[in-house]
C-alpha cells in the first residue's frame, strides 16, 4: 500500500530532477554531485547511518581521521573544483569531516593564495601535495584567546631579526594564545599564523606567516606548545586546539608577501589595502552560504515529509480520518518560509561562488601584471564582495539555525530523538554563527560602508506597497527594501555623526539583514526562467511576505507599506501563497535530490514509511534482548530497601517510647 508521501509524489506535475539542475546551477553540476553522493553512500568508510548519532567524542575523532584518509584517495583523482563539490556534499551529512578538511584546503590554502606570491602558493600547496591531502596539513591561526572579531587587536608577534634573516614568533601572554584552531590539536603540520609584524622596533600591524608546527615524524617543533580545546557543543570530530609560540624562528620568506613585503635589509612595503589580507575569510563565508542552502534543505525536507505522513486530530467529530499536519495553516506558516529560504539560499550561494572566483582571478592577474589601475579596480570589487558575503553569511547562518530548530519542533517529540538528526545538526551548525566572523560584529562591520555609500546617493522614500497587488511585483518589493535601507542609513548617519557608529549597532545589524534579504529576493526572481515561473515565483513571494512581516515595524515606520496591506499579508496574501505551494511540496523537496543517507533521519525517508523505519532504527541500535540496565543495582537497591522503621531499628517506635520513658 503506498504511503501518503508516495501518493502525493505521484501527483507532482514537474520533474524534480530538472528542478535540481536549477538549484545546482546546471545539469552537468547536478549530475556530478549525484555521482559523488552515490560513490560516498556505497563507500563503507564514508557512508553514515543512524549509528553515527551514538558515537562518543573519541570515536568521532577516530572515525573522522579514517574518513579523511579515505577521502584522500578520491582527491588524488580530482581537480580543486571537484574536491570543493565533494566537500560541499559532505557538509550535509558529516559536517565535522567537511570542516576538518576545509580548514586545511579552505582556510589555510585560501590564506596562502590570498596573501602569498605565486611562487609561495605553488610551494606551500601544489609542490607539497596539500591538494591531495599529502605531505603537509594546514590550519588557520587567526583567533586568539583574547581576540576574535577584532583581528587588528591580535597580539602574537613576528619580530624580524635582521642578523639571521628570520622572523621570531612569540606568544607574549596567555591572552595571545591561538585558540579554537581547527586541526591544531592532532592533525596540522603547518599553521598560517596571523601575527603583528615588528621590524626595527616599529609595529606594522597584523600580517600572515606560515609556521611549521610538527616535523615529518609529526613531533612538535621546538618552541611550539599545543593543547586540545576539549569537549565542545558540537563537531567533536574536529581536533580544535590552542597554540603558543616561544621564540620560534622561521625564515623571512615564510612570511606571505603578495602585498606586504619585507626585504633582506628590513625595508617594509605595505599593501594597498589591509582588507586584502582577509581574503581567506571571504572564501569561508561563501562556503557557508552554500552550507546554509544544503543544511536548510535537509531539515525542511525531513520536517515536511513527516508532516505529510503524520495525522493529528479531526476537524469535525464526523470525520473518519485525522488531519495531516501539513494541512494545518499554522504548520504551513512555520515551515513553508524555510522551504522558500532554501531555494533563495541556493541562488545566493551560486552567485557568490561565481563572483568570488571572478574577483580573485582579476586580482591575481592585476597583481601579477603590476597594473595599479587594475589593482585598484579589483580592490573595489573585493570590497563589494566583502560586504555581500558578510551580509549573507550572517543572515543565512542565523536563519539556518532557526530552520533546524523550527523543523525539530514541528516534528513534536520525535524531533527530539537523536536518530532524526536535529539535535546533532543544531549543535554542529550554530558555530557557523560565531566563527569566521561573529554574526553581530560581522553584520555591523559590513553595514558601515553600506551606510556611507547610501548617504552619498539621493534619498529614496515614500509609499511603495499601497495595495495587495503590489506584493506580486518583484520590482516593487526590491524598491521597498531600497527605501527602507535609505531611511535607515539617514537615521544612522544622523546619530553616528555626533556619537559614532557603535551606538547604532542594532540598526546596523538591521541594515545588514535587510540588504541580505533584498539581495536574495532580487536575485531569485531574476534567475527564474519561464518554465519554472509557476512553481518558483510563489516561493519568492512567500519569502518576501515572511520578511515584510518579520520586519514590519521598519516598513511601516518609513511609510513604505500601508497598515492595511501589512495586515492583509497575514490574512490574505500569505495564506493564498501557501495554497499554491502546498500541492508542490513533495516535488520541491525532492528537487533537493537528497538521498536517505544524506537526510539520515528515520522519520524523513524518501519512501515515507515513517513509523516502521523509526521503530526499526531504535530497536537495531538499542537491542531489547536484555532490558536490565548496567546500573540496575542502584535502582533495585532503592526500590527494595527496608522501610524507614526497620532502618531506624525501631528506635522511634511506640514500643521504644514506652520503654525509654518508664
From Swiss-Prot:
Predominant place of localization: other
The protein's Enzyme Commission number: 1.3.3.6
Swiss-Prot/TrEMBL catalytic activity: a 2,3-saturated acyl-CoA + O2 = a (2E)-enoyl-CoA + H2O2
Cofactor names: FAD
Cellular component GO terms held in the UniProt record: peroxisome
A GO biological-process term: fatty acid beta-oxidation using acyl-CoA oxidase
Composition bias, Basic and acidic residues: 642-655
Homology family: Belongs to the acyl-CoA oxidase family.
Protein name: Acyl-coenzyme A oxidase 5
Species name: Candida tropicalis (Yeast)
